[in-house]
Amino acid sequence: MSDSDADTQEYDVIVLGSGPGGEGAAMRASKAGKKVAVIERYREVGGGCVHWATIPSKALRQAVRSLQEFRHNPLFAGALEGREITFPRLLQIASSVIHGQVDIRRGFYDRNHVRVIQ
């Protein structure tokens, strides 16, 4: 069934947005036996938390922190010699974390039979 067919379906609960609040509400309603749909205006689930707020900033911070620990750990002395870790590379690492979070959250909706309408 495509998203265009969603308007012909009936739901017990319709949740606006798939951020943390919407996700929690949708999962609780689904587990209570309700037929649930989530309306998401963006192309991926997760809301601001996943795409531009909490997750990206923490992923970038963790990547930088890990790099600093690696560079200062005597066990790895010289391991990065001649190699450069660039800011675009750190952003790429953070982006991969975001994609992983989207996949996890998409799995929540699928396993709980919650329809996401985008």
Q: What do the PLM-derived regions correspond to, one by one?
A:
Residues 2-5, 10-11, 28-34, 40-118:
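Glycine-rich flavin
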Residues 17-20, 43:
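Glycine-rich Rossmann-fold phosphate-binding loop(s) that bind the pyrophosphate
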Residues 21-28:
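Short glycine/serine/threonine-rich phosphate/pyrophosphate-binding segments
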